[in-house]
From Swiss-Prot:
GTP binds at D62, I63, R64, G65. Belongs to the RapZ-like family. Keywords: ATP-binding, GTP-binding, Nucleotide-binding. This is Nucleotide-binding protein PTH_2729.
Length: 288
């Protein structure tokens, strides 16, 4: 029977578990925070049986679970016996770092109903010592920024290829209908030869071979396409390094029916050949 990849994210309060779960979610994991340990096996079973297969699961489990958390070791033993494979990611930080983070966030420590903040941090560290010893991967976030933690998570659990970490949407549009509001990059191609003024091409779209041939018959189009794709391929690794997981490239002409459609389609083809995950969408292709 198919079983999904299961990562249990745990560790010290304030060490970055929430950000780790967000990073795993960006990598395509189905994430649930603060799930009672007794439900882990059942949850993994439900995910395995889901109509749309869930390949990767990340569960946040920590001391907030109170008495439920105490059952974690027995639960892990049980799922071992059931053949469910899992990894434990444990996040920690120095006492000084955790004290500073709690003071800056002004949020209470889960154990702060008694004792000073440093005392409860040390108490939690002591309670989690055995779980830390079971961890497959331990990350000390004391000197990490959020971006660095995200990069570390991606290096451990992400796909090995850079291309797979970013989903690119290429959208064609017409300037007369407005620029897509969620665009990251906008390019104006109204300087290219316009098929609209060719009677035989006017009623066609940039998806039709005749229109594409007309648009790309211009040396200017070919030169522009080379320079533009070189720019995109240069930018993508830098966007990924900054932690972007989605990129929308908007290509616009006057009405969004001919030139922008042809170029968006070509750009999508080029990026797919480089193994990038690409969706091509033509926003205004059916507008009159």
């Amino acid at each position: 029977m198919f079983t999904p990849k299961l990562v249990i994210v745990t560790g010290l309060s304030g060490a970055g578990k929430t950000q780790a779960l967000r990073s795993l979610e960006d990598l395509g994991f189905f994430c649930v925070d603060n799930l009672p340990p007794a439900l882990i096996a059942k949850f993994a079973e439900l995910c395995a049986q889901a109509a749309s297969r869930i390949n990767n699961i990340a569960l946040g489990v920590d001391i907030r679970g109170g008495e439920f958390f105490n059952a974690l070791f027995q639960v892990l033993s049980d799922i071992d016996a059931q053949g469910i494979q899992y990894e434990i990611l444990f996040l920690e930080a120095s006492d000084e770092t955790l004290v500073r983070r709690f003071k800056e966030s002004r949020r209470p420590h889960p154990l702060s109903t008694h004792g000073e903040i440093l005392d409860v941090i040390r108490e939690e560290r002591n309670r989690l010592r055995d779980l830390r010893g079971m961890a497959n991967k331990i990350i000390d976030t004391s000197n990490m920024e959020v971006k660095q933690l995200k990069e570390e998570i991606a290096a451990i659990f992400g796909d090995s290829t850079v291309a797979s970490r970013l989903h690119i949407t290429v959208v064609s549009f017409g300037f007369k209908y407005g620029i897509p509001l969620d665009s990251d990059l906008v390019i104006d191609v109204r300087f290219l030869p316009n098929p609209y003024y060719q009677p035989s091409l006017r009623v066609l779209t940039g998806n039709d071979p005749a229109v594409r041939d007309f648009v790309f018959s211009s040396p200017v189009t070919e030169e522009f396409m080379k320079k533009f794709t070189d720019l995109i391929k240069f930018l993508i690794p830098h966007y990924i390094k900054e932690g972007k997981t989605t990129l929308m490239i908007a290509i616009g002409c006057t009405g969004g029916m001919h030139r922008s459609v042809a170029l968006a389609g070509r750009l999508g083809e080029i990026l797919r050949e480089k193994d990038f995950r690409v969706t091509v969408r033509h926003r205004d292709i059916n507008r009159v």
